[in-house]
Amino acid sequence: EVMPEDANPGLSKDSKENCLYFTLPMALNYQRNSYKLWEAAKATYEDVETTDVFDPKAVTQMSEGELKNRLVKYKVALQPNKHPEIWRKLCATLCDDFDGDIRNLFIKNDNSVEKIKEYIVGNKKKFPYLSGPKILNYWLYVMTQYTAIDLAGREYITVAPDTHVIQASMKLGLIKDEDKSRADIREYVSTLWEEVFYDTEYCPIDVHTPLWLWSRNGFAAQIEVDKDNELFQSGL
């Protein structure tokens, strides 16, 4: 099954450019079709007239109109004012604190998931939307899958509880129908999956892709859940 992030220009996995490619669009990955976002990101990167939006130093020198036009061209930015502002803020942070290279953020935090999350959340105004619990955890997961960055403490990457993951969790019986109305439903689902995999060889984020695809495909695949299995006792 093809994932949204598979739409990429095939850059060297350990390169600065590759790490930036999988970072900047992620901050705009909310309330939209992820496949279309990454298709737009790839088209933007491969167009010589727009590729410089992936260069933080170039972005900080662009006028508001220049950045907006580049991001809107292939619809990386769906909100023509807000989305370019988010993109510019992230680029400014990368330039001011990490010499325009997102890899330096990981180095500064010893490639530790726990430290990286603590740093970004502690400086959330510098990382608009990327610092949110859903996007932050999923971004870290994507970085482990599509870049050469080797993160320590992978178990601290929690399930990224978007609509599909929540629906799949309910389908499995991990949460009840009435739980959907909880104000903290995302945090609740994330915590339950942490409990399910506590002290096992698996990490919570390992179930994100299967759950996401299962829900997105309308639960076409039939899955039998052994509700006596100790892995599910904490959540049921």
Regions found by a protein language model. Give the residues of each.
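HhH-family (HhH-GPD) DNA N-glycosylase catalytic core used in base-excision repair
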Residues: E1-L236
